[in-house]
Amino acid sequence: MEDFVRQCFNPMIVELAEKAMKEYGEDPKLETNKFAAICTHLEVCFMYSDFHFIDERGESIIVESSDPNALLKHRFEIIEGRDRTMAWTVVNSICNTTGVEKPKFLPDLYDYKENRFIEVGVTRREVHIYYLEKANKIKSEKTHIHIFSFTGEEMATKEDYTLDEESRARIKTRLYTIRQEMASRGLWDSFVSPREAKRQLKKDLKSQELCAGLPTKVSHRTSPALKTLEPMWMDSNRTAALRASFLKCPKK
């Protein structure tokens, strides 16, 4: 699973996921299913924000090719992927500026058009079950919830899906592709089932012990687009650069 994650996700997403796990004392090499889940969630959050801007009239527009002369503001502020201190700093700043209620838990995004925080969920289970779990945890009508599944289903607060159909279709297609690629490598069952995941972990640990003495060679090539990518909250083209360097999963 770890190899799959490093091959199939943007290197910046992988790095952010590793930092997030280490912040909570978790090891990406051991908890590979969680590693894959965090990378998937991060990518969905970036895709959610992609192409969506607010023009000088305050109208929401979709722009797929950036015009440096256009007076555009990103419609969504990405909160997910930052360290907790920075994330809360951004949330507090938004609340002070807009007057919206401060959420109890860190949300994933802020929508400047609708003036609301958004909690994005990606589930391997039934969407309505995961939605209810999220709603029960957040306990706030102020935070909008939007859940996606790997089977193409989705559920959102008051059936308000925020994004246009095409943008949501891109996210659903990506999730379905990830599922198919996992399945083709025999990884999907363990990703869905905790019991199967534990069995696979024991098997992986045993394999590591057997291979501990073997020489290894690792490639650390960096995508050209990422060499110039600044931290995402500093660069106005953060999602465009990220999108440009998305990697497709290579077949075995």
Swiss-Prot record:
Q: Name one GO molecular function term.
A: RNA binding
Q: Catalytic site residues? A: 80, 108
Keywords on record: Decay of host mRNAs by virus, Eukaryotic host gene expression shutoff by virus, Host cytoplasm, Host gene expression shutoff by virus, Host mRNA suppression by virus, Host nucleus, Host-virus interaction
Locate the site labelled Important for efficient shutoff activity and nuclear localization.
195, 198-199
Main subcellular location? host cell
User: At which residues is there a site annotated Important for efficient shutoff activity?
Assistant: 202-203, 206
What this protein is called in its record is Protein PA-X
Origin species:
Influenza A virus (strain A/Chicken/Brescia/1902 H7N7)
